[in-house]
Amino acid sequence: MGGGGAAAFAIFDRDHLRLLNVVNEVYQKYAYDLELFIHCSLDIVDEKAPKANEMFLGHLYTDQKYKSFGFITNTGVRMILVLEANNLDWKDFDIRAIFKRFHSLYCNAISNPFHTFGEEIRSKALLDAATDLISTHVEA
C-alpha cells in the first residue's frame, strides 16, 4: 500500500451509472475491493443526501484500509473520494476544496456539446485533474 494518499476518485450519475472512475496505479491490484468500497459509500450518500444542508457530505465510511468522502450535486450526481484509512494529511477543508474544484470541472465537461448524458465522461481536463489528485502524496 502507499503512503497515506488518495486511492480512487469516482463520479456517478443519479441512476448510479459510473461517469468517471480513476484508481491510483498503486492500488490497481485492489481494484475490486475499491469498487465494493465505493459502492458501499454510494449507499451512504443515498442515506445522507435527503438530510444534507450542503453538497459536501463529509466523511462517509471507513474500514481497515480506506475512508471515503462524498459530494452530491443539486442534480443528483455523486462524487466519491477514497483515501487510505491512515491518511491524516488531508483535512476537511482540503477535501471540500477538492470537491468544489471537481464540481466545476464536471460542469465544464458536461457543457461540452459533444458529451452524451449517461455515458462515461471523456474530458481531458477532468481526467488529468483526477489522475493528478490520486497521484498526490503516494509512495509506492
Show the residue positions of the predicted features:
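Acidic, low-complexity cytosolic segments
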Residues: M1-A8, R14-A140
